[in-house]
């Protein structure tokens, strides 16, 4: 993707791009790069350099937190057309916790340098508003995840995960039990046990490499 194509891609973010002067647009383009991440590749973590704001063109990013023991809890995903702003947490004074970002699929992003983004925030009120809006959206996602973990039973959390995958990708879900456990902040054995129960209830069919949702109505009754 050349610079002209990057500008055309960024123009879809009207709240951001639509309020920039020609000089500011040139500054943005000078401080962006097109990057492709492979499935499972770490994009951002506390140990890596501050990546910047990620505008997702293709694929999917997973944003998560991790305990000292290595237990992961997925906070949210960033899909095509969406923005990952917590990957620029080093220049966002309101963000005081470490997050990790991995690529789930072959993912294409336009990366806006974190420090250039901070400079834009200080000079353009619309960019500051865009930043605040993105943070509010992601904070809402984080609170939804915390609500599920704290107040929902595991069978309901698993049902929500399966239903969201059904809506997004259809009835065939190609995630391992370990991957689902990471998304839900649980153990693989717990996921396997609950999927086996769902299978006995006629909700899913579980095979070695995939899970098939066979009764959407029964699944929705678990939500």
Residues covered by each model-derived region:
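Phosphate-/nucleic-acid-contacting segments
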Residues: 154, 162-223
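Cyclic-nucleotide recognition modules
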Residues: 74-132
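Short beta-strand segments in beta-sandwich/barrel cores
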Residues: 33, 42, 60-65, 83, ...
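Cyclic nucleotide-binding regulatory module and flanking cytosolic helices
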Residues: 1-34, 38, 83, 88-92
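Short alpha-helical segments that sit at the start of domains
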Residues: 144-161
């Amino acid at each position: 993707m050349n610079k002209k194509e990057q500008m055309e891609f960024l123009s879809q973010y009207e709240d951001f791009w639509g309020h920039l002067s020609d000089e500011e647009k040139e500054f943005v383009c000078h401080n962006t790069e097109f990057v492709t991440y492979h499935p499972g590749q770490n994009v951002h973590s506390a140990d890596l350099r501050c990546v910047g704001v990620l505008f997702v063109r293709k694929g999917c990013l997973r944003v998560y937190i991790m305990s000292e023991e290595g237990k992961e809890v997925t906070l949210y995903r960033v899909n095509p057309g969406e923005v990952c702003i917590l990957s620029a947490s080093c220049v966002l004074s309101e963000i005081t916790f470490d997050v990790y970002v991995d690529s789930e699929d072959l993912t294409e992003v336009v990366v806006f340098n974190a420090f250039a983004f901070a400079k834009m925030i200080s000079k353009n009120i619309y960019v500051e508003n865009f930043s605040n809006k993105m943070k509010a959206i992601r904070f809402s996602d984080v609170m939804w995840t915390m609500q599920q973990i704290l107040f929902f039973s595991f069978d309901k959390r698993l049902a929500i995960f399966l239903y969201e995958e059904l809506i997004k990708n259809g009835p065939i879900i190609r995630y391992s039990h370990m991957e689902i456990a990471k998304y839900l902040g649980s153990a693989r054995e717990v996921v396997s046990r609950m999927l086996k129960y769902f299978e006995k209830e006629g909700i899913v069919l579980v095979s070695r490499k995939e899970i098939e949702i066979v009764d959407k109505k029964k699944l929705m009754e678990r939500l």
